Curated annotation (Swiss-Prot):
Keywords per UniProt: Cell membrane, Decarboxylase, Lipid biosynthesis, Lipid metabolism, Lyase, Membrane, Phospholipid biosynthesis, Phospholipid metabolism, Pyruvate, Zymogen
Site (Cleavage (non-hydrolytic)): G247, S248
GO MF annotation list: phosphatidylserine decarboxylase activity
Record protein name field: Phosphatidylserine decarboxylase proenzyme
Membership in a protein family: Belongs to the phosphatidylserine decarboxylase family. PSD-B subfamily. Prokaryotic type I sub-subfamily.
Name of the coding gene: psd
Keyword GTP-binding recorded: no
Length: 283
């Protein structure tokens, strides 16, 4: 009953307006406001500040600045093996596996189509997926899972439902309904996509090459082509791609048939850390 009420209230909320108001508050550099919000978040979400590069909350310019805090150097070691695909984020590996009949698993008993997720019928190259949920207590920066060159970025406006366990089990096609930013890369295994999925109270998605995109800033699908010679934007495995200004979800899509996950496919909701081995590229 409580779960259904939580979902019902989300249908009533003005998603974009709510998230933009949160963004204004979270960007405030008023010391009293931002310090209070940071202390409240640390207590509410049990945030481990010991891992942060900066542990003095007074040094953060705003609540958002705190939420995208950096980790201490070498805290998340990464494999140098080119055949290892690394986790792009701290969080929970909620679902992963093979894309079958153009469908991905959202939650137990719930599927959604790849075509609806990327808003394109050109889906034939993607064969595997992994979904990582970032809770408010997690590190919020997203890193490159494999060496690659940025070829395209697509912004898709949408709803801003919460993406927690309750909502993913109750709302059909959740990740295809929510706002999302899809980043395409050319890699040694072919094309991959790293998808930033927006959510309720997420005050924006940012990438290191484009900057911030506020919740539903664009009313229509937007595409940026980075494939021309004048861009040549390359990333090494482990490089920072961008971040969420609150908890949300990252989905990785990979091509080909030579990717094998490090975990048993009948398991889910596995705690994972950024740079941890996620999958192997087999011969």
């Amino acid at each position: 009953m409580r779960d259904n009420l939580f979902i019902y209230l989300q249908y009533l909320l003005p998603h974009t307006l709510t998230s933009r108001l949160v963004s204004k508050l979270a960007d405030s550099e008023n010391k009293i406001i931002k310090n209070h919000l940071i202390k409240l978040a640390i207590k509410k979400f049990n945030i481990n500040l010991v891992e942060a590069k900066e542990t003095d909350i007074s040094k953060y310019k705003s609540f958002n600045d705190f939420f995208i805090r950096e980790l201490k150097d070498d805290l998340r070691p990464i494999s140098n093996d080119k055949n290892v695909i690394s986790s792009p984020a701290d969080g929970v590996l909620s679902q992963f596996g093979t894309i079958t009949d153009n469908s991905l698993i959202q939650a137990k008993g719930k599927l959604f189509s790849l075509e609806s997720l990327i808003a394109s019928s050109s889906t034939t190259s993607f064969t595997k997926f992994a979904t990582i949920y970032l809770s408010p207590k997690d590190y919020h920066r997203v890193h490159m899972p494999i060496d690659g060159k940025l070829t395209k970025m697509v912004y898709i406006p949408g709803k801003l439902f919460s993406v927690n366990k309750i909502t993913t089990s109750k709302v059909d096609n959740l990740f295809a309904k929510n706002e999302r930013l899809i980043c395409y890369f050319d890699t040694i295994i072919g094309e991959i996509a790293v998808i930033f999925v927006g959510a309720l109270l997420v005050a924006g998605i940012e990438t290191v090459w484009h900057g911030k995109i506020a919740p539903n800033y664009y009313k229509d699908i937007q595409t940026w082509d980075y494939n021309s010679a004048k861009f040549n934007i390359k990333f090494n495995k482990g490089d920072i791609l961008g971040w969420f200004n609150f908890g949300s979800t990252v989905i990785i899509l990979t091509s080909g048939n030579n990717v094998s996950f490090k975990f048993e496919e009948n398991k889910n909701n596995i705690k994972i850390q950024v740079n941890q081995d996620l999958a192997l590229i087999t011969e």
